[in-house]
A protein has these predicted regions:
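Active-site-adjacent beta-strand anchor residues
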Residues: 18-22, 129-130
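Conserved nucleotide-sugar donor-interacting segment of glycosyltransferase catalytic cores
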Residues: 32
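Gly/Ser/Thr-rich loops at beta-strand to alpha-helix junctions
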Residues: 20-29, 47-51
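C-terminal substrate-binding/catalytic lobe of Rossmann-fold NAD(P)-dependent dehydrogenases
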Residues: 36-42, 50-215
Length: 215
């Protein structure tokens, strides 16, 4: 698909910004970056955006409120076993969710978030379409209107969060130039370990592409 993008999009719009929605999200974002040769700020995977929206939904269900009243973020790989919902940082109207829900309930929310995509696919009998489309639109909106929103997206790291040469979900500022800034939040030792494990899994998938000559 990178050949099609180059011949049908970059040919006529050389400054285009690519938002990747295809799975495996992080590896497809990495493949796009390496194949197209675009600046890293113009290749964005929307996985973390979708995962964070699902996290906020499950938090709102547990709290009995509107999802728009909840702030929550998911980082790491876009996959059932690689995503990292940051329950510690989730808030409801400025209050830490950890002070409103029991540890057991928060664990349930995190577990539901991590299997949310697979559960939906099983119920639908096919892949999700509305939520990924809405998440992609949310990313594009911040770019075309230069809204500078803080959104978790799969982006190329060069030392941030202790990782390099991969695309993985982290919070970024999105504006007219695409990725305006990668935001490094302070992680706990446990969160750092989970992020490192997530990155290792993404590297393994990338390695499989290299083995077949796709990279």
């Amino acid at each position: 698909y990178t050949t099609l993008f180059r011949s049908n999009v970059l040919k006529y719009s050389p400054n285009a910004i690519l938002v990747v929605i295809s799975n495996p999200m992080d590896t497809m974002t990495y493949l796009s970056l390496k194949s197209l040769g675009l600046p890293k700020n113009r290749i964005i995977g929307m996985g973390g955006t979708l995962d964070s929206a699902r996290f906020k939904y499950f938090l709102s269900q547990a709290l009995g409120c509107n999802a728009n009243e909840v702030e929550g973020m998911v980082i790491g790989g876009h996959g059932d076993t690689t995503m990292i919902p940051l329950a510690r940082l989730a808030t409801y109207k400025g209050q830490p969710v950890s002070s409103l829900l029991s540890a057991e309930k928060l664990d349930e929310v995190v577990a539901s978030t991590m299997v949310g995509g697979a559960t939906l696919t099983k119920l639908l009998g096919t892949s999700a379409w509305y939520a990924p489309g809405a998440a992609g639109a949310y990313v594009v909106e911040s770019i075309i209107h230069n809204q500078k929103k803080l959104i978790p997206c799969s982006v190329y790291l060069e030392g941030e969060y202790g990782e390099s040469d991969l695309c993985i979900g982290v919070p970024v500022i999105l504006g007219k130039n695409g990725i305006e800034k990668i935001v490094e939040i302070e992680l706990t030792a446990d969160e750092k370990a989970k992020f490192a494990a997530s990155a290792k899994a993404v590297h393994a998938t990338n390695a499989a592409l290299k083995e077949v000559g796709a990279l």
